[in-house]
């Protein structure tokens, strides 16, 4: 299954088509940045871009499974948006924009609506909450994908939806991820009880990024972290 079909007219095996898709994504991304700037806001904050580039660098080094941990209201969504853009426009890590999947175990229509509104239009159908993953099964030729599990501590226990989706699609198998060029990032506000325990994998197979906040920094007020989300 395709996560969306916005780029179906492009053949991703053809270099010129891939380049045209990258140019289109850059155009749309930059226009969204300009739109937010006109409102006196930022689409992606420097801190968010930094963490997304750290994760992208791990992908470039052959890592296929990553964990990003940041406090509630810090701005994980911005990191996700930046990472999606970087992966889909990178010359070193090829991700098919039709195969972006952003899911959560929450049954929350508001989360889905808000997340879609933050994304460029062509990628909005990539967003799914609990009901969208209950029976999700990838095609046999599914590859070149980025799968993002937001708030991965939710519905991740045995026999729950997200974990069952992972097992059904062999996403715990690092060899399978490497062979198919599937990259996974799980986000959470706590390093405990995440979907994929980093301790189950050696460091060369898993990258973990944890945001450390200095709450004594006057430039990092509660309002700042609310705005950055």
Predicted segments, located by residue:
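Conserved pre-motif I regulatory segment
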Residues: 14-67
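Short basic/glycine-enriched coil/helix segment immediately N-terminal to the Walker B
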Residues: 63, 95, 134-145, 176-179
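Conserved Walker A/P-loop ATP-binding site and its immediately adjacent core
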Residues: 71-84, 88, 93-120
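Structural recognition of the conserved hydrophobic beta-strand(s) that form the central parallel beta-sheet
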Residues: 102-103, 148, 181-189
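Inter-Walker segment of RecA-like/P-loop motor cores
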Residues: 104-145
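Walker B catalytic acidic pair
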Residues: 150-152
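Short, conserved "post-DEAD/DEAH" coupling segment immediately C-terminal to helicase motif II
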Residues: 155-182
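Conserved interdomain linker/interface between the two RecA-like ATPase lobes of SF2 helicase motors
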Residues: 194-229
């Amino acid at each position: 299954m395709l996560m969306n079909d916005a780029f179906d007219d492009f053949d991703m095996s053809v270099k010129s088509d891939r380049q045209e898709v990258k140019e289109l994504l850059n155009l749309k991304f930059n226009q969204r940045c300009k739109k937010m700037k006109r409102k006196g806001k930022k689409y992606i904050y420097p801190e968010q871009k930094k963490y997304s580039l750290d994760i992208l660098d791990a992908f470039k080094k052959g890592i296929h499974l990553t964990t990003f941990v940041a406090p509630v209201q810090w701005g994980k969504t911005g990191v996700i948006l930046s990472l999606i853009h970087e992966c889909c426009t990178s010359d070193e890590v090829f991700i098919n924009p039709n195969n972006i999947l952003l899911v959560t175990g929450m049954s929350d229509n508001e989360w889905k609506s808000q997340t879609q509104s933050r994304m460029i239009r062509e990628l909005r159908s990539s967003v799914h909450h609990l009901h969208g993953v209950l029976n999700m099964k990838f095609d046999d030729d599914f590859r070149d994908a980025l799968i993002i599990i937001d708030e991965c501590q939710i519905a991740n226990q045995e026999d729950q939806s997200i974990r069952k989706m992972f097992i059904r699609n062999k996403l715990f198998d690092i060899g399978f991820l490497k062979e198919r060029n599937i990259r996974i990032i799980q986000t959470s506000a706590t390093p405990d009880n995440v979907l994929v325990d980093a301790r189950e994998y050696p460091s060369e197979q898993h990258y973990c990024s944890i945001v450390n906040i200095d709450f004594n920094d006057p430039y990092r007020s509660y309002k700042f972290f609310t705005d950055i989300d």
